[in-house]
UniProtKB/Swiss-Prot annotation:
CDD domains: OmpA_C-like
Disulphide bond pairs: C318-C330
Keyword Disulfide bond assigned: yes
Subunit structure: Monomer and homodimer.
Name of the protein in its database record: Outer membrane protein A
Main location: membrane
């Protein structure tokens, strides 16, 4: 029978195709089995004058815990069958059953296929009854005990939750000869089916999309001399001033002020009264704004503001300059138009691998 069990286990391996049949770590499973139970080396003290039917139907159920890929623990119930002996003078029957506890050691050999061994013990109960001397004497008895248990098998998972196994189990010395009249060994070749709990894959976490980075604000400032744009104390653009603004507009296009904003600031020097100078700087800023709008900058994206004598760039360098003509020339840098452009650049992020 041992040779038959090994041959069947090898045949089961041959049906496999490439990670492991063991359940997921820290999960439970349950199942049942049915097979060929054979009592051997009965050690019977009865002088039987007829056949002893050692080959019987065996069955069982089990419940297990899978600690990891290689190690599990099982508890189960085994019915090892009823072994009758029939003769003209003596006849009777021996039966055994028990609860087993074993460690299950598995090793993956192919896709969804493991080989394993179970090592443990069987707490058994053996019962016997018989009729002797042609029915003149009858006797019965039972015994309990613990015997070592060894099993070898192969297990194939045909879905995540369902698996089938084939194994050969050996239990040594069941019963006591003086109590139940026999002390057989038992081999059980069985086919089983198990259901595994908790094998569903965990749902993938929902990853929120990475928000698009905020656009980068690109700010540039241009300074144009009023003497180039306008005549002295004037607010009308000169031809040379229009040419200067044409060149400036070409640079503004690269910043794309349509998606940003443009601020035109007009400045005056300190010659004259502050109020007229403020009004002049405003008119000059308006002239530059209107010209840039005519070139294509949206009117709602550009503003003009006169600053008058504020923020002079000459400081006190012209304090002692005379006569007036020389002072006007010295203060020329203060007479200016500044254009501040804010554009927005999109940040392009590389997709993650």
């Amino acid at each position: 029978m041992k040779k038959t069990a090994i041959a069947l286990a090898v045949a089961l391996v041959g049906f496999a195709t490439v990670a492991q049949a063991a359940p997921k770590d820290n999960t439970w499973y349950t199942g049942g089995k049915l097979g060929w139970s054979q009592y051997q080396d009965t050690g019977s003290i009865i002088n039987n004058d007829g056949p002893t039917h050692k080959d019987q139907l065996g069955a069982g159920a089990f419940f297990g815990y899978q600690a990891n890929q290689y190690l599990g623990f099982e508890m189960g119930y085994d019915w090892l069958g009823r072994m009758p002996y029939k003769g003209d003078i003596n006849n009777g029957a021996f039966k055994a059953q028990g609860v087993q506890l074993a460690a299950k050691l598995s090793y993956p050999v192919a896709q969804d296929l493991d080989v394993y061994t179970r090592l443990g013990g069987l707490v058994w109960r053996a019962d016997a009854k018989g009729s002797f001397d042609g029915g003149l004497d009858r006797a019965s008895g039972h015994d309990t005990g613990v015997s070592p248990l060894v099993a070898l098998g192969a297990e194939y998972a045909w879905t995540k939750n369902w698996a089938t196994r084939m194994e050969y189990q050996w239990v040594n010395n069941i019963g006591d000869r003086e109590t139940v009249g026999a002390r057989p060994d038992n081999g059980l070749l069985s086919v089983g089916v198990s259901y595994r709990f908790g094998q569903e894959d965990a749902a993938a976490p929902i990853v929120a999309p990475t928000p698009a980075p905020a656009p980068i604000v690109d700010t540039k400032r241009f300074t144009l001399k009023s003497d180039v744009l306008f005549g002295f104390n004037k607010a009308n653009l000169k031809p040379e001033g229009q040419q200067a603004l044409d060149q400036l507009y070409a640079q503004l296009s690269s910043i794309d002020p349509k998606d940003g904003s443009v601020v035109v600031l007009g400045f005056a020097d300190r010659i004259g009264q502050p109020a007229p100078n403020l009004a002049l700087s405003q008119r000059r800023a308006d002239s530059v704004r209107d010209y840039l709008v005519s070139k294509g900058i949206p009117a709602d994206k550009i503003t003009a503001r006169g600053e008058g004598q504020a923020n002079p760039v000459t400081g006190n360098t012209c304090d002692n300059v005379k006569p007036r003509a020389a002072l006007i020339e010295c203060l020329a840098p203060d007479r200016r138009v500044e254009i501040e452009v804010k554009g927005y650049k999109e940040v392009v992020t590389q997709p993650q691998a």
